[in-house]
Amino acid sequence: MTSMKNLYLFSILCLVFFCSCTPKLYDAQRELEYIKADSTLCAEYEVEGERLAELYAENEDSLYIKAVELEAYADRKNKELAIEYSDTPSGLKRCFMLRLDIEKDTLQSILSNLPRDLRKSQWADAIKAHIVTEQIEVGMKFVPIDVVDADGNKIAWDEYRNRNILLIYGGLGCMGRSGRSELATLREEYAEDNLAIVVYYPVSTLEELKEYRDQYSADYIYMSELMPDYSPFKIKYGAQSTPTCFVIDKNGTVVLKTVGVDVQQVKVKIVR
């Protein structure tokens, strides 16, 4: 009886210790503060961009330099704000979106200091997965992901052995008409048994995937995991910005990884 009583008291003490050492629920006011600060940063970026465009309207080189500086400043402030407000839902979500620009040690520290109600959120789980996963980089072997095509058929990656693969993470719309035209020319230039062009879209339903296929060229293979934003593909391949481009050679080695699709860069990596 005494041992049971001691065990009961020990359990209570452990619970009290846990509650006293665990951060409280997230502060709704800080969530509002972050949303306001983020909106302010975005507005300032747009205003300054317009000001620079007018100021350097006749000097494209200077405009480009200033635009790069402005973007770097905005990116830095964006990351700083996300880390500062990582104890809020929106801040934590932004940390996941910026995970490739934040050291994994910093991300681990963020997770360790989360309020209790955010520790088991989808964004916390996604960041955990990112931390423990080695992201695909140039020189590494291609890792197949379970995906389906726009008709709902599971992609059989073995069918693409001994082919070059151009894998594009979303963003055909972001490429613009000229970019899509260059991609179409690339498709015409190489036989399908030499080059497979695969476009991954982070959608939840087949209907959405079919819409992209219908909107753009049916000459490409459209695929998706039909999962939320923190899918295994995004985690393993370190894909966030659209489009992100991967070229996998005939030996299954990733030989190119870039944000944006530079068709000339792609062609250099394709082995006929």
What are these model-derived regions, one by one?
Residues 22-109, 113-122:
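Preference for long, solvent-exposed alpha-helical segments and helix-linker "stalks"
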Residues 172-175, 204, 262:
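Short acidic, S/G/P-rich loop/turn micro-motifs used as interaction or catalytic elements
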